Amino acid sequence: MTLTLTEAAEFRLRTFLLSFSKDENSTQRGIRVAVEDGGCSGYQYSIKIINAPQADDMVLQQGKLRIYVDSQSAPLLEGVVVDFVDGLLESGFKFSNPNATDTCGCGKSFQAGNCSPAGVPCS
């Protein structure tokens, strides 16, 4: 499985992880990148800090950052590039997904062929 973080995304995620990790010591702590049902196009991305992987997680390493991807999200995240933009009008993670057949105008949600769940309107 290939999931790539740009330098900016890796730096931002490592910063989050370090600020979260000061109180606890876990050698398996990392970032979970997942796809969940939701958003206006059916799927939405999720990034969370976790202390340990689940049994079915794929484990990826980029630099000093451990990335976990669950087996259901893996096909939808194959080939994804995650970037972090910090601009005047918008800041946050941006996903470039070759599996997306359509994306929402808000940029936070996507469809992946006929298997996408029904979306809800942007608010």
Curated annotation (Swiss-Prot):
Swiss-Prot/TrEMBL keywords: Nitrogen fixation
Record-linked NCBIfam families: iron-sulfur cluster assembly accessory protein
GO molecular function per UniProt: 2 iron, 2 sulfur cluster binding; 4 iron, 4 sulfur cluster binding; iron ion binding
Any one biological process term the GO annotation gives: nitrogen fixation
Organism: Trichormus variabilis (strain ATCC 29413 / PCC 7937) (Anabaena variabilis)
InterPro entries, alphabetized: FeS_biogenesis, FeS_cluster_insertion, FeS_cluster_insertion_CS, HesB-like_dom_sf
Protein's UniProt name: Protein HesB, vegetative
The protein's role, per its UniProt record: May be required for efficient nitrogen fixation.
Keyword RNA-binding on entry: no
